[in-house]
Regions:
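Substrate-binding/catalytic cleft of secreted carbohydrate-active enzymes
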Residues: 1-191
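Small-molecule pocket liners
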Residues: 194
Length: 194
């Protein structure tokens, strides 16, 4: 990893995300028949990057519910590597550190004063999703983060613009996104980040 070479801290996140069922009762994090899949994905992540010094935090996944399958995944991960803290967005009861996604600046300022009784250390597990002309308040986040010793930063979503070049009939190059190829349905310009 270039992160090892240049000293960039990395949070490695298991490939578990299920927006469709998210945090409701239908979340795949609850049924017993999905437990092995949750544990396997978390352990595959850990085995792949355990020897990379840049990986300082493990993440059980993203936006996939609060169920017992994540407890099993956490237990397996800690048995394999107890040296790194584990986080899972919003589901702070089963992990080592607190997290939240896209908190408002007001929420951040309240958290700094102990208003919400959150688990520490704490980090913003997803923020700075630079859609269009966004992230003008990034300095406000960092003023809150740096105002205390229990906030430990945040994870930028996404680190890359996911659009791709396409060409007009006259050869003019432009950044294309959903719908530019006649594809339906699509997510429009959701990939135009940063």
């Amino acid at each position: 990893f270039l992160c090892d070479k240049y000293g960039i801290y990395l949070e490695d996140e298991a490939n578990i995300e299920s927006h469709e069922y998210y945090y409701g009762d239908a979340s795949l994090s609850h049924p017993e028949e999905w437990k092995k899949a949750h544990v396997a994905r978390v352990m595959e992540m850990a085995h792949a990057t355990v020897n990379n010094a840049c990986v300082v935090i493990w993440s059980l996944g993203n936006e996939a519910g609060p169920g017992k399958n994540f407890v099993a995944a956490y237990d397996a991960l800690k048995a394999f590597d107890a040296t790194r803290p584990v986080q899972y967005e919003r589901n702070n009861d089963i992990v080592d550190m607190g997290s939240n996604q896209y908190p408002s600046i007001g929420w951040m300022r309240g958290a700094v004063t102990g208003k919400y009784g959150i688990k520490y250390p704490f980090h913003v597990s997803e923020y700075a999703h630079s859609m269009g002309n966004a992230v003008g308040n990034l300095i406000d986040y960092w003023e809150a983060i740096e105002s205390t010793n229990f906030f430990c930063g945040g994870a930028i979503w996404d680190w890359v613009d996911q659009s791709m070049y396409n060409y007009e009939k006259d050869g003019t190059r432009y950044l294309a996104f959903g719908g530019n190829f006649g594809d339906t349905p699509n997510d429009g310009q959701f990939v135009m980040n940063g």
